[in-house]
Amino acid sequence: MRRKTMLRLGGALITLFALFGVWVMLLPYFWMVSSSIKTGIEVFDLPIKWIPDDIQWVNYPNALAKGAFGVYFYNSFVVAFAVMGGNLVFCTLAGYGLAKFRFPHRELCFRLILSTLMLPLEIVLVPTFLVVRDLGLVNTYGGLIAPLAVDAFGVFLMRQSIRDIPDSLIEAARMDGCSEFGIFWRIILPNCKPALGALALLAFRDNWDQFLWPFIVATTDNLKTFPLGLAQMEGIDSAAYHEIMALAVMGMIPAAFIFLFFQRAFVRGITLTGLKE
Amino acid sequence: MGREIGVDRTLPSKIRRLVAGGGKRSLHSHLRWAGFFFVLPALIHLIIFKFYPMLQAFRLSFYRYDLMSPPVFTGLENYNLLWQNPLFHQSFWVSVKYMFGVSIPEWFFALALALLLNRRMPGRSVIRLAYFFPIAMSQIVVAMVWKFMYHPYGLVNTILETFGIGRINWLSMEESALPALIAIGIWRGIPLFGVIYLAGLQAIPKEYHEAAIIDGAGVFQRFFYVTIPLLLPTITFVMVLSLLSAVKVFLNPLVMTEGGPNGTTKVLPYFIYETGFAFFRMGEAAAASMVLFVFLFGLTLIQLRLLRRGGVE
Amino acid sequence: MRRFLMTHLLVGLLTALLVSPAFAQQTRITWWGHSNCSKDLVAEWNKKNPNTPVQYDFFAMTPYFQKLTAALSTRSAADMFTLIDFLLPGFTAKNVLAPIRPEWLGYKDLEDMKKAYIPGALDGYIHKGKLYALPPIASGFSLFINTKHFREAGLDPDKDYPRTWEDVGRIGKKLVKMRGSRMVREGFDFAMHSSTWTMWYFNTTIRQYGGEILDASGKKCLANSEAGVKAMNVRARIAHHYKASDPTVSLGTNALPADDLPKGRVSMFITHAGSVAQFGPKVMKYVKVVPFPQVDPKKPVTPIYGFALAVNPHISEAKQRAVHKVLKHVVNDSKTWYERTSYPHPDKNFLNLPGMEDARKTRYLDVFVKDISNGRFLQRSDKVLELNQAIHRAMERVVLKKEDSKKSLDRACKEIDAALAKK
C-alpha cells in the first residue's frame, strides 16, 4: 500500500519534472514565434515582450514574397524525401547484412563504413564536388540527392537495431524455405519498425535542414532549397529578423508533421517499462 | 527473495544468448556471401561519394594546394606546420573539451528523457513533440536564437537576475564562452538521442519484461537486468555517434563567437574550414582533418571494444 | 501516407532526370552577388537587352565566398561575381580574376578612369597596375552619436562631439549610465563581433600614429611597433582608463553590430553609411553622424571598404566584353544604389548629382563622402584574414583580459610572421 502511494507520488513528480523540462526546451522556440509576429525594430527589444502590442501577421506573407519560397519548399521536400527513401532502403539492407551474416572481412567493412563519419564535410567538399561535376550532376536534383542517399549513420543505427532481433526468428523462417530477401522483407522489416521510424525522422530532418551541400551544388533559383532561401534573407541590405523568424517557424512545420506521423512507430506496443505494477 | 536472485542470474544469460548475433553454425556456407550482397549497394555508393573523396583529401594532405593553382607535393610539411602552430593545438583541445562536454551529459540525459517519454502520462504525445522541437529547429536559426538568448541583456541573464545572480556576459569571457556553446549542444542533442533511445526501448519485446515481472523483479532490477542489456546495441550507437556528431559542430561558433574570445571556441572543424576556405591552404586543412580522423577512428574503436567487453557480442 | 511519399519520390526523381541537361544558352551572362538591389538593375537590363540576358543569383554573405572559391577551383563560377575589397589580393595572387578593361567602359586608360572617381577610391582594387574589380558602392566608417544622450549629459551635439580618440574617452565617460556597479549604458563602444571590424579600427589608428601593420614588402609584421602599441592603447584606455565602455557587452550583441545604438544601449558608435538605412528615419532623427575620430584631426585617416564586381577569367574575350557592358549599366546607376542601400558611390561627382541636395542635408552624405575621401583600404595582403584574426585575438587579450598591449602585439606579430612565411 505504502509502496503504491510512493510510486504514484513518484509518477506525479516525474510528470511535473517533464513539464518543467518542456518549458526549458521550448523557450527558444517561443522566442522565435514571438519574434515572427513583431516589427523588425521590436525583435531585439529587451526586456522581452512575449506578445507584442500589435501582432504583425503580415510578416508571414511578406517573408514568403521575398523569394521563390514555393519552389524552395518543394525542392526541400523532394530532396528530403528522396534522401530519406535512399537511407531507409540502403541503410537497412546494409545494416541487416552487417548484423546477421558472417562474411569475410565483415568487421573491416563495418569499420570502413563507420570511418566515413569521421571527416568533416568541409574537407571532402571539393573532391565530392568534383565527383558530382564529373557525373554531370551540378545544379540538378541528382546532384543534390545522390551524395547524401546513403549515410553511415543510418547503416550503424540499423545494424545495432537489427542485432536485437533474435536469430531464432530468422532460423525458423529459413527452415520454412523463405528466401533471403523474403526474410528481410517479412521478418527483419516488421521487427525493426521503431528504428526505421527514427531513421526516417532523422534523415528527413537532417536533409530538410541541409545547407552547405545544396549551397555548393545549386546555383540557380529553381534548385535552391529552403535553408538557402532562409540564409539569403540575411543579405547585407536588410537584416529582417522578424521575417527570418517567420520563415523559420514555417520551416519547422514539415519536420513537426513528420515527427507526429512517425511517432506511432515508437508508441506502438506500449509500454511496460514504467508502470503496471 | 530466492526467486529474485534467480531472475538476476538467468535472465541476462538468456538474453545474452538471444542477443548474440552471428556464430550460428547452422548458417549454410552459401549464406556467407549473401550478407555481403546486402551491404554491397551501400558500399558502392560510399566508395563513389565518400571513400574516393576521402582518399583525395588524404593525398592532398601531402601537397600545398590553394584550391586555384595546381597542387605542389611537399611531403610531410603540412603536418610539420600544424605541429608548430599553437593555434592548431588550441583548436584540438577545444574540440576535445567540447566533444566530451556535450556527449557525456547526452548519454545520461537522453536515456532519462527516453525512459520518461516511454511512460504513460497525461498529454504524452504533446510532451514528446515539445521535446522534439529543438531538433526540428533549423541549425542556422538555433545559432541566431541562442546568440540572442546569451546577449548581456538577453533572456538567460534576465532569468538569472530574477534569482539574484548578476549579469554574465556569456560569450565574451574565456571562462564561459565554451560552456555556453556546450549547453546548446546538449540542448539540441538530448532530443536527438532521446528519439533513438526511445526506438530502442520500444523494440524490447514485452515478453522479457513480463517474464521479469512474473519472476518478481522490481523496477530497478528490470532496468539493470532487462532494459540495459537489451538496450546495449543502442547505447553503443549513442555513445559513438554522440561523440562523432558533437565533434563536427561548426556553425554555432562561426555565427555566435567567430571562434573567440581569444580562440577559446575555435573548434577543429572551424579551424579546418578556415584554413582551407578562408586562408586557401587546403593541404594544411586536409592534414588537420587527417589528425582529427585518426583521433576519432581510434576513439571509436576503443569505444566499440570496451562496449563489446561489457557484454554485447 | 506511403502513397504520398512514393509519388513525391517519383516526381523528384523524374524532375531530376528532366532538369539535368544544363540550360545551354547562347550569350546568357551569369552573375553571383549578395545584394537584392542588383536584382532590379538586372530586370531593367534584361528588358533593354533581350539578346544578352543576365541571370542574377543571390547568395547569403558568409558562405558565399566559400561557394565562390569552390566554384573557381572547379572552373564552374559565374561570368561575373561580387567580391569584398580585402579578399582581392588572395584572388589576384592566384590569377583567378580577369582584369577590368577601362577602355571597354569608355575611359582612355586606368589613369583617366581614376580621375572620374574620388581620389584613392579605386586603390583597393588595383594590383600591379591593373584594375581587377569595379565598385558600385564605397563605404567608410563615421561616428554616430545619440543627440538625446548628449543633451541629457549637458553637452551640445553640434559643438561638443569628439574629434580625437581622447575626446571619445573623455566625452564617452560623461555619457555612461550606471546602475550599481553595472554599466547599463555605454558612452562609446567598438564593435567586437568580427575580426575584420577590429582590423578596420586598428589599421586606421596605427596609420593615424604613422605606422603600418606590415612593412613595404608585405613580409614582416610591424604591428608591435610604437605606433601599434599606441593604437592598441586607444582601445585599452577607452575601456579601462576612461571606463567609457564595457567591452564584454558588445561581443555578444546580435547580428547587427550597430544595433546597440538605436536601442539606446550605447551613446556613440562607429559604423558605416549603410546603417542609416538600417536604423530608419525615426532613429536618424536623433542620431547625428560626425567624422571618424582621429589622433590628429589635421592629418585625418579613415577606413574605407567596398564591394566590387569581378570578371571570371575563364570565359572568352567576347563574353568578357559583353560582361563589361553589364558592368557599365550597373555602376552607372549610382543613385538607385544609394537610395536603396544608403551606400555612396565612389564617383567624384556623386554629391552633385541631381536630387542629392536633400540627402546631403538629411542623411549626412557630406560627412560620409568626406570620410571616404580621407579613406585608406585595409592592409593589402593575401593573408589578410590571418592578419585580422591575429590582431583580433591580441585586442581581446588586451581589452578583455587586460594584458599588456606590447606583449599581446608581440604574440600577434609572431603569429602573423608565421602566416606570412607560408607560401
Where do the PLM segments sit?
Chain A
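A structural signal for multi-pass alpha-helical bundles of membrane permease subunits
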Residues: 4-5, 10-277
